[in-house]
Amino acid sequence: WPEGSAMPAEPGLAAIPQVERTLGFYWSEVSTPEGGMSTSDVFYNERGVCIVSNSCMQSREDGSGQPGGISYNLRRAVAERAVSARDAIHILMELVDRWGYAPSGRAYTVADADEAFMIQIAQGRRYVAVRVPDDCVLIMPNHYTIHDPAAFDEFWMSDGLAGEAVRRG
């Protein structure tokens, strides 16, 4: 990519700087007669990293209310940059920490041949992520399912998330 390039972004959303070299990937998008659906993609890259997602509607009030943020490009950034599922989960957290998340909420699952992770993201800069244990099956419905991250051997959450949850009841 030429120096100073940005990843393609929808109008009004964060234009994420492109990295110099990207990985090849397969991309599948659900489409309607009107065209593709922005957040209905599945990516699988040349290093064997797959990312899928499902919407998670917020149960209380909306998040930060700040304009912009990242949406579609989270999947693409993982496809272009992640060399493992573990790398992918850190890329996701770094991008949300830096740019914020535009939609109301989403669950992403990233996996490779060795590991799988789920991250659930709310609007703004709020998320919780867990490594899926090797002897477990992951179910990704249209709502938040990580209620006790400490029940997992490996988990991460955004700064201030626990305090905000207590404050909101």
Task: Label the model's feature ranges.
Residues 1-71, 91-169:
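A contiguous strand-loop segment
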Residues 63-64, 74-82:
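Second-shell loop/turn segments in exported
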